[in-house]
Each structure stands twice: as C-alpha cells, then as structure tokens.
C-alpha cells in the first residue's frame, strides 16, 4: 500500500514564478499546470 499526494502549485510558487504579471497572463498557464499534474498522477498510478 502506498499514499501519494499531488496537486497544483501553491500561491507562493505562482507569485515567485510570475512576478509583476497580470492575472490574465497567469490564467493562460493554468490549463498547462493542471494537465501536468493530471499526467503525473496517471503515471504514478500505472
């Protein structure tokens, strides 16, 4: 048995990665971040 936890990056990570960026620009990246987390989850489950 194993337990693993994956999730989207936190607010601090977003603030660090995208300083001085408009929220609209940051929102562009949300689907890519979500897809990366979903893909990683699928790989771990396999």
From Swiss-Prot:
One of its GO terms (molecular function) is acetylajmaline esterase activity. Its EC number is 3.1.1.80. It catalyses: 17-O-acetylajmaline + H2O = ajmaline + acetate + H(+); 17-O-acetylnorajmaline + H2O = norajmaline + acetate + H(+). It is an enzyme of class 3 (hydrolase). One of its GO terms (biological process) is alkaloid metabolic process. Keywords: Alkaloid metabolism, Glycoprotein, Hydrolase. It comes from the Eukaryota. Glycans are attached at residue 39. Deacetylates 17-O-acetylajmaline and 17-O-acetylnorajmaline, but is inactive toward other acetylated alkaloids. Belongs to the 'GDSL' lipolytic enzyme family. This is Acetylajmalan esterase.
């Amino acid at each position: 048995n194993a337990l693993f936890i994956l999730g989207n990056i936190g607010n601090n990570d977003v603030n660090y990665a995208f300083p001085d960026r408009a929220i609209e620009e940051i929102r562009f990246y949300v689907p890519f971040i979500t897809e990366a987390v979903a893909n990683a989850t699928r790989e771990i489950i396999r």
